[in-house]
Amino acid sequence: MSDLKFSIITICYNSSKTIERTIKSVLAQSYTDFEYIIVDGASKDNTMDIVKRYEPLFEGRMKWVSEPDKGIYDAMNKGIRMAQGTIVGIVNSDDWLEPNALQILADEINQDPSNREKILTGEVVFHYEDGSTQLYPTTYERYEYFAKRYRMGLNHPATFVPRSIYDRIGVFDERFKLYADADFIIRCYEAGVGVHFIHKVLSNMADGGASNVRSRRELDDSLLKYKKHCKTKSEYLKYATKARIMWFLRYFVPEWYVRLYRQQHNKK
């Protein structure tokens, strides 16, 4: 389909150590009908110098803005509003795409045009700081299991959303600091939005991103998420109590155990 255009969005702030890899991964795409949108939060390092150096290589397919924002999801929403493509993907400044990621997505849509109106999601390879990796698979069963428990059931770095779904469901809820992507996917699940699962690696994610940092914000976002989505007060109390206990215990659990738990948890 000649009118199938992708909008790839990268948000960044002081990302000079990682953003070049991200930019190169977009530039290397074998499918070339895309626009690349970079939303920078007025970085104080040389992030924008790197962006400007690569801009000519995109031959008019890159656009960027560099200005203060109100947080991660304000920046993402800004990028979505700038997007003109049919399908929108968010590739953060410490993530990078596989070279054939967009071609795989285009093939899936060309083979079944109904996929144009569905969320498309694939597999992610998570890269730990010690050099080890973990494959995060994607299945409907896993998606449903987590969505029913108000949790993120898709690999966000490998998830691509039709612009029409953002128009229908809405963009990211900026009250969240860490979990607006999970909230968005839960809203899609509750609204019956279709999801097409691709059992191929589309993206890579490095350890150390904002969602991987343990903090009070994590608990606050969990409580907001449960308050927003739980159907009854008793259900909210159940999940909120568990969230508070888990957040407290994590400060007394060694990092290796947290990592092991995360790996086992995502095999379900």
What are these regions (language model features)?
Residues D33-A42, K63-E67:
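Short beta-strand/loop segment that forms part of the nucleotide-sugar
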Residues V65-A83:
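Glycine-rich, basic loop-to-helix element that forms the pyrophosphate-binding segment
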Residues M1-A28:
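N-proximal low-complexity "stem/linker" segments adjacent to membrane-targeting elements
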Residues T139-E218, S222:
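Conserved nucleotide-sugar donor-binding catalytic segment
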Residues T32, D40-D49, N92:
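A conserved acidic beta->alpha catalytic loop
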Residues N100-Q134:
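Conserved donor NDP-sugar-binding/catalytic core segment of glycosyltransferases
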Residues N46, D74, D95-E108:
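Acidic donor-binding/catalytic loop of UDP-sugar-dependent glycosyltransferases
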Residues V88:
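Short aromatic/hydrophobic "clamp" motif used to bind/position activated sugar donors
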